[in-house]
Amino acid sequence: ELLFRKVEEKVKKAIFEYGLIVDGDRILIGLSGGKDSLALVDLLGRRSKIFRPRFEVIVTHIVMSNIPYRSDIDYLKSRADEHGLSFFVHETSFDASTDTRKSPCFLCSWTRRKALFDIAKRHGCNKIALGHHQDDILETLLMNMIHQGAIGTMPPRLKMDKFDMEIIRPMCLVEEKDLTRIAVWRGYRKQIKNCPYESGSSR
């Protein structure tokens, strides 16, 4: 519990340091079932009820109909229910043959991201919270330097004018090792994923 409070303080610091959340925000979380998104639901779900700024959180789980694995949707819903958060399931798919220049992992990620924007708009959200942590941000920086020769990574806050939406990363100051320990403490149930495309990913 002390560790959870420590992580909450890091999330609080990120919220105020980067202006991630303000009063009246309605925020969508995409819950994949991994430890990072489960922790994000716990952190923002709790914070939305007892701390300022006051904001609303809704949770969605995106099912890719052409990927042969399924998460335990009842379990994911129970994690949202614990904080009194609305939970929605959205099903979509992608066709890997439409653009052979792009990897299936890219197309899947892009399709999920587009679905998040559509769901956020449908439910009146003005922000989408992603579960990237400090290690993800540093890894992206290194990958961009190695593969593209450019210095750049995922910002804590990104305004998407095209979609009239903001992407926020409230766990940008949180180390992955702390999230791993929280997952054990909270007893997060590991979701089994066997993606046929995962061996081709560079991450």
Identify the function of each model-found stretch.
Residues 1-142, 147-150, 155-156, 177-185:
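ATP-dependent adenylation/nucleotidyltransferase module used to activate substrates
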Residues 153-154, 159-191, 196:
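Metal-dependent de-N-acetylase/amidase catalytic core
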Residues 198-203:
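RNase H-like two-metal-ion nuclease catalytic core shared by retroviral integrases
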